[in-house]
């Protein structure tokens, strides 16, 4: 359970209704972050931003696709059905690196920024972290192309709460053509 983790580097991408009430989630994640040596937080998620603004964390790195005040910020974002690219700037050093990921969707680019910030917290250079991400092709059941025939592409994604479903649908709307979506309802909360 996350309640027992004592990480050196804690990454918090977002807080959204999933398995517990929002208040329980806020408390759970605040405690998780407070046990870490370094915390990495996404300023593009309102709940995570609130924690970044209210918690007195010893060493905090932030990232964002939008907020110029973040420690790691993306600019010149390019979206394509087969991936994303951007320039990542590290505010503390002024250093920049091009990041290319082979997974589509702004949420995946945000995950890449989180990975870069965590790598920097561990002493990896910005350029090395960006280079390492170029080899990441995604994981099973996350916008995974499972087949195609006659110009029809079948994609499997295990989005299982409203925020994740919205992110997946937003990404799929970047693909050309019509969408036919099937959803298997699962409980959450």
Identify what each model region corresponds to.
Residues 154-160:
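Switch II (G3) loop of P-loop NTPases
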Residues 41-44, 158, 185-186:
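Structural motif
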Residues 139, 163-189:
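Active-site beta-alpha connecting loops in nucleotide-dependent enzymes
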Residues 45-46, 160-164:
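Short beta->alpha connector loops
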Residues 3-154, 177:
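Acidic, Mg2+-coordinating active-site environments of NTP-dependent enzymes
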Residues 109-112, 162-166:
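Short glycine/serine/threonine-rich phosphate/pyrophosphate-binding segments
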